[in-house]
Amino acid sequence: MEWDSDSTPNLAFMQKGDLAPDFKLKDQNGDERTLSTMLLNGPVVLFFYPAAMTKACTKESCHFRDLASEFAALGSQRLGISMDSVAKQAEFTAKNDLDYPLLADVNGDVAKLYGVKRSLDLLKVKRTTFVIGQDRHIAEVINSEVSMNTHADKSLDVLRKLKA
């Protein structure tokens, strides 16, 4: 994992208005992705989920998939991230026909940067979504461990307001 010169490691929870740390991670195909490159094509909805192939994470990820046309209409991109391996992300993608990148943050470095890595919990990261504008500032932070649809639904609401 790498971060750029104006993104320093920050273990505090990232908040609305903060500059989102840039990073480089491999996706489910083994291709390297950076936040800054993805932002060239529009806002990014970056959602952290605890573990691929689990019931709640599958529901959340599939809801993001099912709303693909709405995200596309707003010129935004969806980007999932967990501490699973590239192979596990590939399996999760194939099993659920996901149409967006899933990043493998195996060591939890990016989760630490965004302040969502748990220290002693079975769930490795806090289920959190960051809506990031093209200027790399966080437009909104969405938290919910119980309502899986909230993440995609609220992200769309934020993106609509940004576009208005």
Describe the residue ranges of each PLM region:
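Chalcogenol-based redox active-site neighborhoods
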Residues: M1-A164
